Amino acid sequence: VLREDAAVRDAAYSIVEHCDWMPALLIGAKHINEVPRSRCAAGHKAMWHAKWGGLPSEEFVCSLDPVLAGFRDRLYSETTTAEKPVGKLCPEWAERLGLSTDVVVAGSEFDCHMGAIGAGAKNNTFVRVIGTSTCDIMTVSPEELGDKLVRGICGQVDGSVMPGMIGLEAGQSAFGDI
């Protein structure tokens, strides 16, 4: 969209991942800076990493595509893992859903990563999640993995599947409705 539609590009202020938008909506976040950001989404899709202070530099981002100029400074530096509360249900959504404003809203992560948890993922367990896409997920302790970079996978992110574990993601094969 940014490459194809200058009007959209010029009007765009930032970018929000769907799994970040849903908790933000439920807690009543009104400004982009109030949107809780998923470690899973940030790490696997935006190259977020604590070692370099969050997201890649503006220079790096622009080297990938100059159309991304300016977005880096309007994004985020902090992320949260899915087990941590990001707020409570706002009055609007509490009323719409017939729930209390005391309902705690958790952080988020991608469907595949949550599917791995549902399938019983634990340290050194390989899980293949099959749905509209197919992902291979494995978790490894940071002590065991150390500074190794696993080649040939699409993501290696601390806390993206389970807290305190490195989530390894491979696959993303087309599946389902194709």
Question: Each PLM stretch: what is its role?
Answer:
Residues 95, 103, 108-178:
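Catalytic phosphate/nucleotide-handling subdomain of diverse soluble enzymes
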